[in-house]
Amino acid sequence: MIRVEALELGYGERLVLKGLNFQVERGEFVGILGPNGSGKSTLIHALSGLLAPRSGKIIIRDEHLGSLSSRLRAQMLGVVPQTSDVRFPFPCLEIVLMGRYPHRKRLGSLTDEDLLWALRSMRRTTTEHLQERPVTEVSGGERQRVVIARALAQDPQILLLDEATSSLDVRKKLEIFEILRFLNATKGLTVLCAMHDLNLAALYCGRLMFIKDGGIVQDGPTEEVFTPAILGQVYETPMEVIRHPGHQRPYAVMLPLKEGEIEGDAPEVARA
């Protein structure tokens, strides 16, 4: 469904990612992990068409991403950014209905089916009570859930998320990922999400891609790559991986840094 070949990405004179080669099949749930500044968001921007590659190819369903019309691209790809800068006081329902525009007939108006899609998506993201509220007057977490509802109403084949739940509380974060898991399992929705939460990624993603130093350093099934050695290599932090007693998925436990491992002028701290 997605094929990336010899991809190089950057901004101005700065090269961020180089030599990327990977494929994502329909129905995969992929977590993109790595330290701050490693290029996770850059990759999501490129896959969504917001950032043109310096070189290489991004193929979506046998079509070059750059050759797709904005309408066709929006029918295939849904994108949820880390934050949404919505400056106009549109009602939240209207924001969600914007996700239906790629499916409208040319010069056609919104249909009852479009409204049903929007209301269903708001119900799934527990934002139905915000229908008439101006999006500029809801909290940041509520606004982000409205934006996620818009992406679900879009009914894409591929959903790209860039730290999309980082502003949500624990309960809402889990609710969103349960929705994604349900759509992934029942409708074959392909999900790629850039994340910082290691254990959330291990819980929901079937495949993990670790990015560091301008490239992909590890890529594979979660059960194979979520290991102390790989996590330590990527994050330069000592960790243990255990089986969570509740869900039996791998679970990372961070260990304290030893003396001499802290960068900068860290104060001396007496350890208990």
Q: Model-derived features: where do they sit?
A:
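Conserved catalytic motifs of ABC-family nucleotide-binding domains
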Residues: 155
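Helix-to-loop junction immediately C-terminal to a conserved catalytic motif
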Residues: 48
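Conserved ABC transporter NBD signature motif
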Residues: 56-64, 73
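Catalytic Walker B motif of ABC-type/P-loop ATPase nucleotide-binding domains
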Residues: 159-163
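The feature captures the beta-strand-to-loop junction immediately N-terminal to the Walker
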Residues: 33-35
